[in-house]
Amino acid sequence: MNQAEKAELLEQLEQWNKKDEYSRCIRAIEAIPEQERGYLLTVKLSRAYSNLAVLGDHGEHGTDGEVDGDLIRHAIELLESVRAQGENDPYWNARMGYSCLMAYSSATTACEYAKRWLALAPDDPDAQKLVRDCEEYLEEGKALELDLKEREEIIRKETPDDVKKRGGICK
């Protein structure tokens, strides 16, 4: 693939991405032999898999929050395959941050990539937003954890001693 063909493909991928046609992006990139794709097309392929996993073509997943775990894990594997080239690339860190957040519901892991993205592109409002979102998820997780501990403590205090001696309510 020469430079003009690659530029044309990249433009077409952007158009399909804007139209939520992620499967078309995947088919077009996967039609190119893996050893000829290079870094940028591998990252674009990962983006297409990630978007398909989370949004579906033409938003078919809607807002149900359901994520195709196999597709999102494949997106991460693709990013891992070009980690050496991507670690200092804001775009690679962005894709890894979003994918990890969706794959594992892990704001901790996603936040690491988001902060790296922000360090590499401090003026990028999307990087700033992902860091804020991850930090909010982490705070919500801590609050939920505390809430569960508080509830458990209340239940222990309110459970009569004879029930405790029998080993609990459900025995």
Where are these regions (language model features)?
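Amphipathic alpha-helical repeat scaffolds of TPR domains
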Residues: 2-11, 35-61, 87-102, 125-137, ...
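Short coil/linker segments at helix-helix boundaries
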Residues: 50-81, 101-102, 109-110
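N-terminal leader/linker segments that initiate helical-solenoid repeat arrays
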Residues: 1-25
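Short helix-adjacent coil turns
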Residues: 20-24, 105, 122
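Solenoid-repeat scaffolds in large eukaryotic assemblies
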Residues: 24-25, 58, 110, 143-147
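TPR/TPR-like (Sel1-like) alpha-helical repeat modules
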Residues: 64-76, 107-126, 132-139, 146-158
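Amphipathic alpha-helical repeat elements characteristic of tetratricopeptide repeat
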Residues: 3-7, 23, 69, 73, ...
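Canonical positions in the second alpha-helix
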Residues: 31-32, 81-82, 116-117
